[in-house]
Regions:
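C-terminal structural segment of proteins
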Residues: 1-260
């Protein structure tokens, strides 16, 4: 297995065009698990750790551009924790400090797992994913980016360059249920915001991201609406019935927090 280490985004895109089957790797928190458990073995690994354009975040006319290499630790401890509080809460629940220091939001989106912790808080903020290739760039709403369990719209020659959103500055929160308090894959997760409109998105309860909205004056029925929008399954972490019930309970608790 060959490892390529580009130093600019242009070099990375050229490498991806030349090796469309290459696996991008930055934090490696998902890729290394896949390799260690023989879930795949590409001919080429594309190491993106030296590509400065993918790191950090910038402000653009009131909007934010989050580099795909932005880590959970960056979000948890940096300036973004006050700007995107639900995403910061989600970041604090991811794995261990070592995982949060390495794991990236671009990796979370690229893996496209229904349990991805970054997806619900990004979705309630209307995030848009910027995909790049030598052919150009395109922006896809996050709600349309993930198409199923570990499937997305990325073309073989594309990389996730960044995520764009305009902070709502609305009360928001993130909650997660698992078999223990830390270092756990979510049985159910939930992000909720409350402005003139209530917005909710959940994880581990549908094959792809779902955004549920309602007028603020329909708060009393919102938890039931969120649970009805889910499409959970039975698996080793929880049953369909439990997940749907837990989602309704979490939504009720989240609403009390954001509407207080």
């Amino acid at each position: 297995m060959e490892v390529l280490t580009p130093h600019t985004l242009d070099e990375a895109l050229r490498a991806k065009a030349d090796h469309p089957g290459a696996w991008p790797i930055q934090g490696g928190t998902d890729v290394m698990v896949a390799l260690n458990f023989d879930r795949g073995r590409p001919d080429v690994l594309l190491n993106l750790n030296e590509v400065a354009e993918l790191r950090g975040f910038t402000r653009e006319n009131g909007s934010l551009r989050l580099g795909s290499g932005l880590t959970y630790a960056d979000i948890e401890h940096g300036e973004l924790k006050d700007v995107l509080p639900a995403l910061a809460e989600a970041s604090r629940t991811v794995g261990s400090p070592q995982i949060r220091n390495r794991g990236t939001i671009g990796g979370n989106l690229g893996t496209s797992s229904p349990a991805g912790d970054a997806l619900p808080p990004l979705l309630i903020e209307g995030a848009v994913v910027e995909c790049a290739s030598l052919r150009g760039r395109r922006r896809i709403p996050l709600v349309d980016f993930v198409t199923g369990v570990k499937r997305n719209v990325l073309e073989p020659d594309e990389l996730i360059a960044s995520i764009h959103l305009t902070p709502s500055n609305e009360p928001q929160t993130f909650m997660k249920i698992g078999p223990r308090n830390a270092m756990v894959i979510a049985v159910v997760s939930l992000a909720v915001s409350a402005g003139d409109e209530l917005r909710a998105s959940f994880g581990s309860a549908s094959p792809r991201p779902v955004l549920v909205t309602a007028p603020r004056d329909e708060a009393d029925s919102f938890a039931e609406r969120v649970a009805a929008a889910a499409a959970p399954i039975d698996d080793v972490r929880g049953t369909e019935r439990y997940r749907r019930h837990a989602l309704e309970v979490l939504t009720t608790r989240a609403l009390k927090r954001v509407l207080a």
